[in-house]
Swiss-Prot record:
<dbReference type="InterPro" id="IPR036394">
    <property type="entry name" value="Ribosomal_uL22_sf"/>
</dbReference>
<keyword id="KW-0699">rRNA-binding</keyword>
<dbReference type="Pfam" id="PF00237">
    <property type="entry name" value="Ribosomal_L22"/>
</dbReference>
<comment type="function">
    <text>This protein binds specifically to 23S rRNA; its binding is stimulated by other ribosomal proteins, e.g. L4, L17, and L20. It is important during the early stages of 50S assembly. It makes multiple contacts with different domains of the 23S rRNA in the assembled 50S subunit and ribosome.</text>
</comment>
<keyword id="KW-0687">Ribonucleoprotein</keyword>
<dbReference type="GO" id="GO:0006412">
    <property type="term" value="P:translation"/>
</dbReference>
<keyword id="KW-0694">RNA-binding</keyword>
<dbReference type="InterPro" id="IPR047867">
    <property type="entry name" value="Ribosomal_uL22_bac/org-type"/>
</dbReference>
<dbReference type="InterPro" id="IPR018260">
    <property type="entry name" value="Ribosomal_uL22_CS"/>
</dbReference>
<protein>
    <recommendedName>
        <fullName>Large ribosomal subunit protein uL22</fullName>
    </recommendedName>
</protein>
<keyword id="KW-0689">Ribosomal protein</keyword>
<comment type="subunit">
    <text>Part of the 50S ribosomal subunit.</text>
</comment>
<dbReference type="GO" id="GO:0019843">
    <property type="term" value="F:rRNA binding"/>
</dbReference>
<comment type="similarity">
    <text>Belongs to the universal ribosomal protein uL22 family.</text>
</comment>
<comment type="function">
    <text>The globular domain of the protein is located near the polypeptide exit tunnel on the outside of the subunit, while an extended beta-hairpin is found that lines the wall of the exit tunnel in the center of the 70S ribosome.</text>
</comment>
<dbReference type="GO" id="GO:0003735">
    <property type="term" value="F:structural constituent of ribosome"/>
</dbReference>
<dbReference type="InterPro" id="IPR005727">
    <property type="entry name" value="Ribosomal_uL22_bac/chlpt-type"/>
</dbReference>
């Protein structure tokens, strides 16, 4: 069956943190996945929920699939670019702060 995808690039959270939430909804039905994401307290849950809703809308509008039969066929979290920032420290030194980003790809199928 055809897989319908939605992608969110350069999400401002690390891939490790997003994967913690993504592993909970992999291969679940869409209704169950949305329920899990609704009750999660993590920022990544909000990001994944937006991408999942977009994938559901794509499946319904573009391919005419029935929402009740959909499940999360694939969810892929890749590392995005890393922004490097400087934090001043004592005695004229500086530490590097890494602002990590991630790419969230959600695929739904029948």
């Amino acid at each position: 069956m055809k897989e319908v995808k939605a992608i969110h690039k350069y999400a401002k959270t690390s891939a490790f943190k997003v994967r913690l939430v993504a592993n909970q909804i992999r291969l679940k039905s869409v209704d169950e996945a949305l329920n899990i994401l609704s009750f999660s307290n993590k920022k990544a849950a909000v990001l994944i929920k937006k991408v999942l809703n977009s994938a559901i809308s794509n499946a319904e509008h573009n391919d005419g699939l029935d929402i009740d039969e959909l499940f999360v066929a694939s969810i892929c979290i890749d590392e995005g670019s890393t922004m490097k920032r400087i934090r001043p420290r004592a005695k004229g030194k500086a530490n590097r702060i890494l602002k990590r980003t991630s790419h969230i790809t959600v695929g739904v199928s029948k």
